[in-house]
Amino acid sequence: GVGSVVAHKCAQASLNGAFGHITLASRTESRCRKIAESIRQRYGVEISTAKVDADNVPELCQLIRTVRPFMVLNIALPYQDLHIMDACLECGVHYLDTANYEPPETAHFEYSWQWAYQDRFREHGLCALLGSGFDPGVTNVFAAWVMKHELDEVHVLDIIDCNAGSNGQAFATNFNPEINIREVSARGRYWERGEWVQTEPLSWSMTYDFPSGIGPKKCYLMYHEELECLALHLRGLKRARFWMTFSDSYLNHLAILKDVGMTRIDPVEYKGQKIVPIQFLASLLPDPASLGPLTRGKTCIGNVMRGVKDGREKTVYIYNVCVHEDCYKEIGSQAISYTTGVPAMIGAMMIMTGKWNKPGVYNI
């Protein structure tokens, strides 16, 4: 998954002196050891591993004080963001993540919980960098670059995320199944003329003709966290939306699972035990980390931005194309994890070199 990509890319960068010692920690240390062995075989770099429960702040603090890192890269679940931020504050280390906080009991995410840490991180002289993945992350950088170099005002922003790859599975997610299904099943939301407008889940769609030989694909309107930040900072913005492609097979399976209650996030009674259906479902689905050798095709993620330059209307499309097979050949991962993990490594490098190291809590 993404954690493996981040560890591999940080190890690669350490060969050039960008990073010192790396410790990879997880609730399941055996997975960390497998990643560490892959890194040793590929690059000759030794990294440490550790077992930690990211929901347990004292346990996190004990590990941080033992390792004494410059910063913590949080590639855990969004539910754990605040616990890890608390531990970083207590131990005096910088923080980075790739996804904003989401409470386990509610399928709703927003940055307000993490932005509330602004004063505490600033007072401690620590930097917390939020959303250092691809979307959010690189899509924010794309927007800032276009605003700086291509447009005087941005009137319309459409972020479009296409996975044109195939893994041959009837139903599988390319990152944590529980998080993926919660996100896709939620109501859509977009920003227009200063207000948030809600839509029913996956009720709006459009067809977009993607570059690099991908061609036309159906895209569905969703809510994605970078919209919350970009709506505040893009000069002249009138509308901002996020779109993602899904196969018919994925959507059909998802609809059936929802109809029979398997996407519920509340506990249910089963033979005297409380279980959460979506968590049980996630345990049955393929591990996203296992999909690398099975996945073929390309991803294309980018921003379509329409606005004004020198008084004239102008549209800019800035995007990235990644090939699943190339990612697997390089580090044993599919492109979804790769495109999230590489920006996390770059964000960490920017903090460690001081280029982005400013006390407080910031989005890319």
Q: What positions do the PLM features span?
A:
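Hydrophobic/small residue at the entry helix of a nucleotide-binding pocket
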Residues: 2-3
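Rossmann-fold NAD(P)-binding glycine/threonine-rich loop
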Residues: 99-126
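N-terminal Rossmann-like NAD(P) cofactor-binding module of classical short-chain dehydrogenase/reductase
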Residues: 64, 68-74, 95-96
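Short beta-strand element of Class I
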Residues: 21-23
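C-terminal catalytic/substrate-binding lobe primarily of soluble NAD(P)-dependent oxidoreductases
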Residues: 148-364
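Helix N-cap at the beta1-alpha1 junction of Rossmann-like dinucleotide-binding domains, i.e.
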Residues: 28-31
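Rossmann-fold cofactor-recognition segment
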Residues: 42-56
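Conserved Rossmann-fold cofactor-binding substructure of NAD(P)-dependent oxidoreductases
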Residues: 53-68, 80
